[in-house]
């Protein structure tokens, strides 16, 4: 099964955990042995952190692969994949490391397994420097399912920084191939909704204040739509630790979804958290694209694997997206073209089309 070994420099471009996620997922899918060097070389704490390690171990277990050099602080790993299998797989960051990032690395792999999979992912569900689980369920899920598969995400417990302790269970069945997607028509915004949550000891007033501040901020720019942000107190038995945050979604007439989100920190007042999320959403609505800045890079691996040409329209192409494209081209040999959008209404905006000729990956087990 093994092809020639792929050599990856983990310090280039985004230079972080994303390079590991993209390269190990593609290595696993394509049966290519992989060596990643200089892992997170430029970061303040270089090398593997607990959440990266749990992701690597999970991919190893998904395919009965061999993994060397995988320990906290290690800056070099080698990975030799075998056949991807379904069944129940568990990954636990044992920290507030993001369960959503564990999903990012494992999901493309289990789509090409021999049988249905159930992923038990433990860590932070609403953590910094990663999508919140609400984003994954409300934005990522409906869009990524356009590639022609379905998954179920059951949030058992929410976990926050610094303790983690959250758990989600993801269930999905394998596919024969992925369909290409074409997301180039934004349409107009028809709905804005969201949730502002508090968990643990934080008073419910914090959730109400975040929601109210966000609504006021959005109203300044969008006056003709009802903005429905629900304040929520997470049930005690479904949340571990204390936390607060907000996610706001805008939905368009063509089914595009955009989000703005923010998490509370000690000493930051609730209004500021709400306004930060609202401003992020508004910025994502200004650029004319069909996906927000956080969805861009999460679609690249699926576009690379799909059978045909995919197109998405984006705002400014993020470094994460450029990095994902670089490794999808290097490892999977997919072909990407990124060009400025030519549409009349996009002329004044920083809007791009990312086009990919996918490799038409076929599940050998089906």
Swiss-Prot record:
ATP binds at residues 104, 131, 294, 297-298, 320. Keywords: ATP-binding, Ligase, Nucleotide-binding, Nucleus. Its EC number is 6.5.1.4. The keyword Lipid metabolism does not apply. GO terms for cellular component: nucleoplasm. It comes from the Eukaryota. It is found in: Nucleus, Nucleoplasm. The active site is at residue 320. Catalyzes the conversion of 3'-phosphate to a 2',3'-cyclic phosphodiester at the end of RNA. The mechanism of action of the enzyme occurs in 3 steps: (A) adenylation of the enzyme by ATP; (B) transfer of adenylate to an RNA-N3'P to produce RNA-N3'PP5'A; (C) and attack of the adjacent 2'-hydroxyl on the 3'-phosphorus in the diester linkage to produce the cyclic end product. Likely functions in some aspects of cellular RNA processing. Function plays an important role in regulating axon regeneration by inhibiting central nervous system (CNS) axon regeneration following optic nerve injury. Belongs to the RNA 3'-terminal cyclase family. Type 1 subfamily. This is RNA 3'-terminal phosphate cyclase. It comes from Macaca fascicularis (Crab-eating macaque).
